């Protein structure tokens, strides 16, 4: 239920793995190519953390449907990833 709530709000949020070495950032993706722009997808950016006090190195990003992003979010939580805000000022 928490997953559905977070994704319904469509806000930007960051997950970090157990080793604190990798992050994924989920944020709403607005398709401006359509006549009436709407948010029906999520951009998932991923990167590495080399030092906790430094800016993470973002390796890439991709756009997924909201449903696919929900599945990935749930899978990451099941693997032990945690929601974090420590890199919010860098991203």
Q: Which stretches of residues belong to each language-model region?
A:
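Terminus-proximal functional modules
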Residues: 1-75, 79, 84-91
